[in-house]
């Protein structure tokens, strides 16, 4: 299901009136722009990692991105460039997967593999992920920024399914791929690849496979809104 369309279900009319007015760019919006009048910037338009090669600084009232930042090669650098597009007094609205709800303590992401280059948390010091960013910290460190709001969005998310299929033992073995011991890394890779190839892809059996609830109508994400001070 389209992520922006799903997210808009939990947004009140005031959200659109306050943040998505004027000149809006939707980075990674594809065929599901956050609002009809948004200018979409996607792969065909250039590399969002270096968006200032294509767009002028301080030229947008709102910079929106949904499930795009996690694909960038250098997360802080991309986030900083996107911020430079915002006019003084404008806003940046960013939605990213929540690492506990989406990745479910599995890295690389079991749904996107290496497509996701980082995971995200919200105002927690520690993370199980080797490549985790606190999106709140990234936001507050932007120049002339004020964080308007930051929230976990979990519409229709069934916490009863969280971590049910990939058991504790399997999770431990999966995490061995980052072990300092070569034997553990190899064993972890072999076990996971065996399950993936023989049970989750080639077979109709899904025993042991984690549940990606965002494949239907659930949200498992963080939304943060930042204002650029005049």
Model-derived segments and their meaning:
Residues 1-9:
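Conserved SAM-binding loop and adjacent beta-strand
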Residues 9-13, 19-104, 224-226:
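Conserved SAM-binding loop
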């Amino acid at each position: 299901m389209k992520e922006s369309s799903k997210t808009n279900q939990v947004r009140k009319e005031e959200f659109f009136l306050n943040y998505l007015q004027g000149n809006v760019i939707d980075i990674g919006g594809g065929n599901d722009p956050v609002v009809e009048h948004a200018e979409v910037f996607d792969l065909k338009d250039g590399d969002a990692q270096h968006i200032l090669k294509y767009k002028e600084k301080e030229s947008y009232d709102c910079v929106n991105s949904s499930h795009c930042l996690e694909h960038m090669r250098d997360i802080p650098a991309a986030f900083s460039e996107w911020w430079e597009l915002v006019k003084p007094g404008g806003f940046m609205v960013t939605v990213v997967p929540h690492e506990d709800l989406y990745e479910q303590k599995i890295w690389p992401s079991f749904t996107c593999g290496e497509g996701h280059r980082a995971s995200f948390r919200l105002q927690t010091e520690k993370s199980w992920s080797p490549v985790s960013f606190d999106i709140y910290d990234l936001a507050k460190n932007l120049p002339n920024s004020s964080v308007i709001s930051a929230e976990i969005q979990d519409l229709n998310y069934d916490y009863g399914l969280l971590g049910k299929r990939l058991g504790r033992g399997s999770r431990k073995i999966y995490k061995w791929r980052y072990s300092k011991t070569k034997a553990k890394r190899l064993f972890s890779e072999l076990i996971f690849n065996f399950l993936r190839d023989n049970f989750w892809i080639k077979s109709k059996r899904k025993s042991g496979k984690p549940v990606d609830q965002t494949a239907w109508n659930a949200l498992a994400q963080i939304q943060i809104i930042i204002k650029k001070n005049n």
